[in-house]
Amino acid sequence: MRSDTIKTGFEKAPHRSLLKATGTIKEKGDYRKPFIGICNSFNELIPGHAHLQELGRIAKEEVRKAGGVPFEFNTIGVCDGIAMGHIGMRYSLASRELIADSVETVAEAHRLDGLVCIPNCDKITPGMMMAALRINIPVIFVSGGPMKAGCTPSGKTVDLISVFEAVGQHSTGEISEQELESIEENACPGCGSCSGMFTANSMNCLSEALGFALPGNGTILAVDPRRNELVREASRQIITLVKNNVRPRDILSREALLNAFALDFAMGGSTNTILHTLAIANEAELDFDFSELNALSARTPYICKVSPATMAVHIEDVDRAGGISAILHELSKVEGLLDLSVPTVTGHTLGENIADAEVKDRSVIRSVEDPYSATGGLCVLYGNLAPQGSVIKTGAVSAPMMKHTGPAKVYDCQDDAIKGIMEGEVKSGDVVVIRYEGPKGGPGMPEMLSPTSVIMGRGLGDSVALITDGRFSGGSRGACIGHISPEAAEKGPIAALQNGDTITIDIPGRTISVDLTDEDIASRIAALPDFQPKIKKGYLARYSQMVTSASTGAILKTPVSCEPK
């Protein structure tokens, strides 16, 4: 066992003395058992994590019963909703790297034999996955579970996005202050990751397809008693994984990644999943290119439409309809789309995991013969505005905006854009451009939920597009194109845009372009001053210098001698 490094032999007496002082070692026989890290992310700032202390307790209890010695430790976490619309959002994506590094540090420093990872919200799940693949010891994921959707006294179903959009509605006088307060009070009824197919729930659903989590991980509600049972089962299973030395890189393959992307496209997951899955592939040293995604999306039917694409369906409804296993089982009917032979943490193949799954509600999960669209709910757009690509959640775009041409309304930061939209600067037909908000420029590639919500709230969702080198919340809807690469801070074409330039978006054609020649763009770029970092000290200053393009997952640069082969 790896942990023998810190517990076996007379020379390890000091180590054992310290371990005994923790109170976790109950008897000398514990030194012969595997040491299992309970990698929790409990904190009281994130509703998706406020209940995780109890899940950690359950995990420790089950690991000990199953023959291991549990050691709980915590990672940090950021609530994207609370961090939205101010300096805090610049820390959100950047926190993913801190989480990965911190999990690596604890597991390696203490020679743990395996990990039970308990994430939930946006950057915690991918951060833990990146660490798991980096250290490559047996790991199982069990999330905290989704939040239940809210309901106003009038019977209207609401969620967090309802609150953001209500701000825009209130600013135009469409709803009263009392109506806004009612939505605010009822949208988030308790613990769990926000209730739609936003980033957190998207990633926890993908965990099942990647093979890192047990069936039910993505959809069983945080308040459902089955969530606690799932934690118990996962905590027992880690002992089996350790005994059999089943490690993350034994599970994650190129085929498993393609399975996860197919699921993502079929349920219209968050655009952030592309960013995170590319980063996860990098940690596994798997060769996967951004440009491959459109071919897969073209073969994947969009069969499960969930908030924000529709307010009629939330994650609890997906669970009731059969969960992720049912979606995957339905997708398996498309010849060659899924590789069902890939291994998973259950000890069975993906195909075996989903063999008995069935769709219980066709209004939630459609058949592959009757999809919402024949192609997936996410895609990549290329063109002279995004030579390295950009992403859009097509499943949340209304029909009138699938093709759009309009004049650019350019803002060099999100705050100016929000102010301009609220003050009526943006008119029907415009294309709002928010730049210098990419991984380097932001820094941290902040989400644009506030401006997209204000656009929707002001009734412009069917007539205004928004493009950015930043990114979008999983809760954003409308013609929102993010991750434009190269970013403005790297003198990408988006930096050349001026007010009034004609931008054309063709989602079916997978293109985004500006009516300028290559020479026009080059001359404008040449006249620009070099980008000056907005933050000069602390973590974000270092992050800005080290982060790479969104098209590669916004991973950090490493020394050439340390780069994956």
From Swiss-Prot:
Residues modified as N6-carboxylysine: K123
Gene Ontology CC terms: cytosol
Active-site residue numbers: S473 (proton acceptor)
Residues annotated to bind [2Fe-2S] cluster: C121, C194
Cofactor: [2Fe-2S] cluster; Mg(2+)
Catalysed reactions listed for this entry: (2R)-2,3-dihydroxy-3-methylbutanoate = 3-methyl-2-oxobutanoate + H2O; (2R,3R)-2,3-dihydroxy-3-methylpentanoate = (S)-3-methyl-2-oxopentanoate + H2O
Its job: Functions in the biosynthesis of branched-chain amino acids. Catalyzes the dehydration of (2R,3R)-2,3-dihydroxy-3-methylpentanoate (2,3-dihydroxy-3-methylvalerate) into 2-oxo-3-methylpentanoate (2-oxo-3-methylvalerate) and of (2R)-2,3-dihydroxy-3-methylbutanoate (2,3-dihydroxyisovalerate) into 2-oxo-3-methylbutanoate (2-oxoisovalerate), the penultimate precursor to L-isoleucine and L-valine, respectively.
Subunit structure: Homodimer.
UniProt similarity note: Belongs to the IlvD/Edd family.
Protein name: Dihydroxy-acid dehydratase
Origin species: Chlorobium phaeovibrioides (strain DSM 265 / 1930)
Taxonomic lineage of the native organism: Bacteria, Pseudomonadati, Chlorobiota, Chlorobiia, Chlorobiales
